[in-house]
Amino acid sequence: VIPERIADIVKGIARGCEKANTALIGGETAEHPGLLSEDEFDIAGAATGVVDADKQLGSHRVKAGDVIIAMPASGFHANGYSLVRHILATQKLDLHKQYEGFAKSLGEILLTPTEIYTLDCLALIKAQSENIKTFSHITGGGLADNTARVIPDGLIAKYDRTTWALPGEMKFMAEIAKVPQTDMERTWNCGIGMVAIVDPAIADLTIKSLAARGMKAWIAGSIHAQNGPGAAALEGNYLTR
């Protein structure tokens, strides 16, 4: 164990906890010689929250006509790195190189910290608890799979790709490795890290409230009636930069 490295790791975890207004109540450091090399480390963590049963958000609150408010991702976040590593290896990309169109090296881009949306979501709930239906954190599985988990039977969430542009780093990786769009959208967040499903009456207010907090959000779609289990789909073509 290198003390300075452990200190840097804990500082990073503490910064994340501060951004989520979460207490760091403990932890353990274990050495595994023979399993991890001196330059490797593995980190795991968990957070627990409490909510009154009658204040739970979820699919039971979602209705046809509700609006999908998207919050931008800061990058790949913590998902889809198996595909990223595959592309790095097969395309022989240089992590230290600053590729055309980017202000940082590829390695720096891939290490961009994951955006933490906790306080933004809590602020919306506090201000409009009756009209905030639910949230969906876009992690493994992409936009459609994650959103479908909070959509009840008989409804479908439809995203309009024309409302946002695919992040440059994802476009670059997909194009250079010829990744099909369907595979990309099942693996990466494609630029959206969190969505709030809200009553249409507060859609504009929600966007303004998030903007006041420094979060540039937008209307990315809406909820529609359909026959079948709850689902989500993406339509149209991404904006071009």
Predicted feature descriptions by range:
Residues G58, Q91, L95, L143, ...:
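Membrane-targeting and insertion segments and their boundary/processing signals
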Residues V1-S82, S222, E235-N237:
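Glycine-rich anion-binding loops of enzyme active sites
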Residues R5-A20, L36-I43, E100-L111, E115-R241:
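Glycine-/charge-enriched secondary-structure boundary and capping motifs
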Residues V62-E108:
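Acidic, glycine-rich loop-and-beta core segments that form the ion-binding/anion-interacting portion
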